[in-house]
Amino acid sequence: ATIDATISLELITEASKRIVPNAAAVLDVGCGAGNYTLKMLSKVPNLSCTLVDLSLPMLDKAFERVSAETNGKVVVKQGDIREIDLEENSFDIILAGAVLHHLRDDQDWETTFTKLFKLLKPGGCLMISDLITQDTDLLNEYTWQRYGEYLEGIGGAAYRQKVLDYIEKEDSPRSMNYQLDLMKKVGFSKVEILHKNMCFGAFGGIK
């Protein structure tokens, strides 16, 4: 139950196309069924695509869907982006949709952002669409209250509780400010905010 998922997907892929109009290779981190890559291919055709996910059934589905839409090479890698071996300076675009909020402590975040930075070619971009927090506790409480009301509106009180309990147990999102600052720290030359609505945002950085 993501707020503004459609517009965030549109914005990060359109921004990627404009930042790297001659892109040849995309990496999709936590690709799921391949929706982000498919949207990217609708804007920049025939990219070579590397799809990473923990779930083999999802990877199989993504491979089938993406292969049908590009003449470029499609590579699938099952596993965690933190552990998978990929060649540095080899991607024009990295897409990370609803995945980085699984990172845990500061070291985990910094190590992962450093790795993603190194995987990009100079001038390439990392684009993120994800669950986020606020830096101010009072505002953070407010945004999660709003999100809870949104969830209840689409699925009732039990659905709201189920989603929020899952997030509490499984996820450790950070604020957009934290992630943009971290991008600068690990070497990104520019960072950009594309969209934000309560506890969801779309943003990125250019190497």
Segments (PLM) and residue ranges:
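A short beta-strand submotif of the Rossmann-like class I SAM-dependent methyltransferase core
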Residues: A96-L100, I128
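C-terminal alpha-helical "lid/dimerization" subdomain adjacent to the S-adenosyl-L-methionine
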Residues: S129-V186
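A short glycine-rich, Lys/Arg-flanked "PGG" loop and its adjoining helix->strand segment in the class I
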Residues: E110-P122
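Conserved alpha-helix/loop element of class I SAM-dependent methyltransferases that forms part
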Residues: A5-N22
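Short glycine-centered segments of the SAM/dcSAM-binding site in methyltransferase folds
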Residues: A25, G124-C125
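Class I SAM-dependent methyltransferase SAM/SAH-binding core
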Residues: A25-V29, A33-E83
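Core SAM-dependent methyltransferase catalytic element
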Residues: K184-K207
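A short acidic, Gly/Pro-enriched loop at the edge of an enzyme's catalytic core
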Residues: L86-I94
